[in-house]
Regions:
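A glycine-rich helix N-cap at a beta->alpha junction
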Residues: 54-83
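Small/aliphatic-rich secondary-structure junction motif
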Residues: 30-48
Length: 118
């Protein structure tokens, strides 16, 4: 099974990105072989910027995205959203990939085709 997460909010200031990544990690941990794709759009694109520093004992979305990648998940970042925020591909954490809406559409098609509709 594949689960596609489309995140739009900034990495900090709300907990939507944090909670989406928590759910992604739990799916990967509890269901080996569960494919997870995280697509970062809008302000969420900055979640994949490498080298973020957060206060001690505060969640770090870089580490959370890295955990998704280490478990063979995908992290795709909207290229247009990156451009609007001055992010270059080399600014991203290792494993995150600049992407497009066309790729998101393909991921959605794969997700829909694999969905359990019973």
């Amino acid at each position: 099974m594949t689960t596609l997460f489309i995140l739009n909010d900034p990495p900090y200031g709300t907990e939507r990105v944090y909670n989406g990544l928590r759910l992604a990690a739990n799916l990967q941990r509890l269901d080996e072989g569960h494919d997870v794709v995280v697509f970062l759009m809008g302000d969420a694109a900055s979640a994949a910027k490498a080298g973020q520093s957060v206060p001690n004992d505060y969640y770090n979305v870089n580490k959370m995205l890295g955990n998704v990648l280490r478990r063979d998940g995908k992290v795709l970042v909207c290229g247009t959203c990156m451009d609007a925020r001055g992010l270059a591909p080399e600014d991203l954490i290792d494993g995150a990939q600049r992407s497009t809406l066309d790729e998101l559409t393909q991921e959605r098609i794969v997700f829909t085709a694999n969905a359990d509709v019973s």
